[in-house]
Amino acid sequence: MCSIHLPDIVFQLDIPQIMPVMSALVLSILLGLAAVWTHADLMCKLLDEFQRIVLAVVTRVVIPILPFFIATTFCGLAYEGTITRQLPVFLAVVLIVIVGHYIWLAILYGIAGAYSGENPLRVLRQYGPAYLTAVGTMSSAATLAVALQGANRAAPPLRRDMVSFGIPLFANIHLCGSVLTEVFFVMTIGQMINGSMPELSTMILFCLLLGVFAIGAPGVPGGTVMASLGLITGVLGFGDTATALVLTVFALQDSFGTACNITGDGALALMLTGYADRHGIEESDEHRQLFNTEDEKKIGFAK
């Protein structure tokens, strides 16, 4: 049986990275901490401006050309027959990941219920609309209003001040479903492309760094995997083909990953409420200052 090879590349433009991923990560963390420690207002403003510049480049340049990159890579894989051989594996992986989401949510709500002393199902059953909205939008930011409404319907046991503080915060920094999915996918694709999974030490480093990167990832479709592309290529050493596979397979289940993120926020809000009750923190009325318009009725804070 003869093997199929792609024609030679006519033109290729290699753009090397400015610095290694680890150097960029350590520099960003130390620079941010030092700016806070020294109260360097000018540097903080510069970093904020730089963040907006980077986000503008990502949204206006990287994301628009990303579908073409994935499409051309998959054309090559289809020409070689790789897609046909691996399609059942992809579908099985997506189903396993979705089941993993439910298992993790059960664990998370179980821990929240044990810590707070409340029935976590009273919170979980209010997250049906938010879960479906997240499946449809694939965006934590777009689902925030529905998540606030569901969390407010769960008060009690949730406290409204904890809801108004915690839910918007967790929607941006708590991406448990996306992180769980990405870790599973990189191991699977590493096995498929390279013939072996990444080493344990490499995966531990990747998971630790991914947790940091996920906190700063935007709550938009594909935000987590886009923010961690440097880790995928730098730490795991994935090439163009493996990276394109990660992006594509991640997009197949991004709806359910986002839904897991949003639904898990309710468990964290329950933990936050339990912490406030255990430490005698009185309930604040400041949430009324945040939702004192007519929109309050739409998100459930007004009766």
What are these regions (language model features)?
Residues 43-61, 87-90, 94, 120-131, ...:
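Hydrophobic alpha-helical segments of integral membrane proteins
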Residues 262-303:
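Cytosolic juxtamembrane C-terminal amphipathic helix followed by a basic/polar low-complexity tail immediately after
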Residues 1-124, 282-290, 296, 300:
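Signature of multi-pass transmembrane helix bundles
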Residues 36-41, 49, 80, 116-121, ...:
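Juxtamembrane helix-boundary/capping and inter-helix hinge elements in multi-pass membrane proteins
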Residues 51-54, 90-107, 124-134, 203-217, ...:
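Small-residue-enriched core segments of transmembrane alpha-helices in multipass membrane transport
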Residues 190-194, 229-239:
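Interfacial segments of multi-pass membrane proteins
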Residues 98-103, 134-139, 172-180, 211-223, ...:
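Hydrophobic transmembrane alpha-helical segments of multi-pass transport and channel proteins
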Residues 133-214, 282-287, 291:
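Helix-loop-helix junctions within the multi-pass membrane cores of secondary transporters/permeases
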